[in-house]
Amino acid sequence: MDDWKSKLNADSLPWLLEPDNPSVRHFTLRDLLGRGKDDREVRAAKAAIPKSKIVREILAAQKPGGYWEEAEKKSWPTHTYVALAILAGHGVAPNAKIKKGVEILFRNNQHASGLFTWTGAKSGALLCFTGDMLFVLGHLGYADDSRVRQARDAYVAQLRAKSDLGCSRNANKPCLWAAIAALRGYAALPPNPAARDVIDHLANVLLTHKYDFAGAEKPWLRFGVPAGFDLIAALDGLAHFGFARDKRFGKLLDVMLGERDEAGRWMCRSFNTKFVVEKRGAPSKWVTLRALKVLAKCKS
């Protein structure tokens, strides 16, 4: 499992294993070093996650009603979604407070069709949003919830119907971010053979696109926390579903590798202003972890 390290220009693993960020340490031990869930250090790192500063801050900011910042309403739940996305990404086990927030998203933002919507109406079910929600809910332990299964199946139908990935918020132009969101969402759930044709199509869309990282796709190199629609997210989804051996993948991987510094770290170039996880313009443990996980998936 260690041969992926040959791609590194420096070993950043000791840095990722430092105890100041137990979530990063936990994922590094588990996903990069291959430690099992019963490993003593893995268990210790996981137990420390709820005590970390950012997790405590986010949970402390939750309102008694279960939402964050804005009152509960049928609209895009910016703060609530972001809070839960960060908690999910940090590997926080769902507790009563988190479950209360999740129920608000189900109640206000899942349409009867199963899709998740910004507005409560089906017209607000953008191609990227259900994928984002599947990612969060899958990582929070809701993969087997009937509402998530309904969303999963409705999302397959939506993506088949809009195979051109036209986005209503962008003059109906193809939205590669939707492809990233979908791959990321389905990667967080148990394998679903019924979705394989859609996954293959989305992967092909990402692999055949003519990228201009100095122009239109420059924002794809603005890696940040929580993970957004960027090159690392695209590569992670592609690698998860078995496309790492594709030559076109290799070219994109070289672009990602070109963004590391001399110490083998990647920078945080974007962050969410509602809950600041890391400092912009500084080496990022989270971005570095994400990049190294892509390499590990390529070699696994």
What are these regions, as identified by a protein language model?
Residues 1-300:
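Preference for long, amphipathic alpha-helical scaffolds in soluble/luminal domains
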